[in-house]
Amino acid sequence: MKWKQQLDGMQAYKPGKPIEEVQREYGLKEVIKLASNENPFGCSPKVTAYLQNNAVNHALYPDGYAQNLRTAVANHLGVQETQLLFGNGSDDIIAIITRALLYPGVNTIMADLSFSQYWHNAEIEGAEIRKIPCVEGAHDLEAMAAAIDDQTAVIWVCSPNNPTGVVIPDTALRAFLAKVPNDVLVVLDEAYIEYVTHPEHKDTLPIIDQYPNVLLLRTFSKAYGLASFRVGYAIGQPTIIEKLDPVRGPFNNTSLSQAVAAIALSDQEYIEACREANEHGKKQYVEFCEKHNLKYFPSDTNFIFFDTKADSDVIFQELMKKGFIVRSGNALGLPGFIRVTIGTEAQNAALLVQLDNVLKEQGVFA
C-alpha cells in the first residue's frame, strides 16, 4: 500500500472511556462520566418530546443542504443562509478546512495546549505545524502573530480554549486579527460559546464582517446536549463557504440530527437555565481548588482544568475505580492536571468527596 508517510506512528483520537467499559472493568453499578464535556442535564425537553412522537423515513437520504436547520440557524444568528456550513460535528468541519487549505509546503499555527484535532488533521495533510506555547492557559496571540509568514495558510484559535477553559477578551482578539494577512484563514473555534460569562467577551459575529478571513466554528454537542447527533456548523463569508462546501461529504447530517438541532435551537430558555446551573457547579470546583491551594484556570466553559499536585494518570485511575470518569492532563498536554466536566450539583459534590479522599491517599494534603 502506498500510504501517506505522515500516517506512520499516528493514532486515532482517543475519547474518554465509555461508561459501560468502566462498569465492566470495576464491577460498578453506577458510573458518572465527567470527561467529555457533555451537558449533564441532557437536551431540551422539546427535543425529547419530538423524539418520542416522531419518526423519519430511514430509507431516504437526508437533505444534503440541511435547509430547515440552515434557515433556523440563520434566523437565530441574523446571518445569511449562504454564510453557513454544516458538518457531522465541528470535527468534520475541521477536517474539511485542513483538506481544503493544508498541504506540504504550507504551515498552520495553533496553541500547544488546545484541541488535538487541529494538528491531527494538519499532520494528515502534510502541512508544517507551528505550536505556540500557551501562557497561563491562554493563547499567546502576540507570539502566534509573530509566527506568521508567507506560507501560513490557517491559524486556529480556540476560545474558550479546550482544555483550559480560558476565553480571549474582545480587545485582544481584535488586536490579533488586525495583524493577520487577509489571505490567511483564522478559524475561531467557539464550541463552548454558550457558556461564556466573561465581562470582556463580546459577540463575535460582527468580526466576520470586519475580518472576512475569519471563520467561526460552533456545535450542538455541548450546551445543546446533542453530542450523539453530531451537528456542528461554521459561520463565515459566503466566499469562504463556497470554497469549503465542495470538500464536504454528501449527506453529512442525518435527517433526525437536522430536526433535533433546529428544535434545540428554539429553546433558548433551556440553554439559559443550563448556563446558570453550570455557573453554580463551577463554583463548587473553584471553592475546592482554593480551599486546597490547587491551581486552576479561569473557565468560561462547562469544564474546569486544575492541578492535582500528583500524577494525573493515577488520579484518573483512582477516581475511575470509585465510579467517576475524568480526563487526565497527561493525555491533554499538561501532566498533573485533570479536566473535569461540570456536572449536576449532586454529581459535583459526590466527585469532590472522592477526589478529596484520593488526593489524601496520594499525600497531596492531610
UniProtKB/Swiss-Prot annotation:
Q: Which residues carry this modification: N6-(pyridoxal phosphate)lysine?
A: K222
Q: Which GO terms describe its biological process?
A: L-histidine biosynthetic process
Please report the name of this protein according to its UniProt entry.
Answer: Histidinol-phosphate aminotransferase
Question: Can you tell me which family this protein belongs to?
Answer: Belongs to the class-II pyridoxal-phosphate-dependent aminotransferase family. Histidinol-phosphate aminotransferase subfamily.
EC number(s) stated in the UniProt entry for this protein: 2.6.1.9
Q: Where are the transmembrane segments?
A: none
Catalytic activity, reaction form: L-histidinol phosphate + 2-oxoglutarate = 3-(imidazol-4-yl)-2-oxopropyl phosphate + L-glutamate
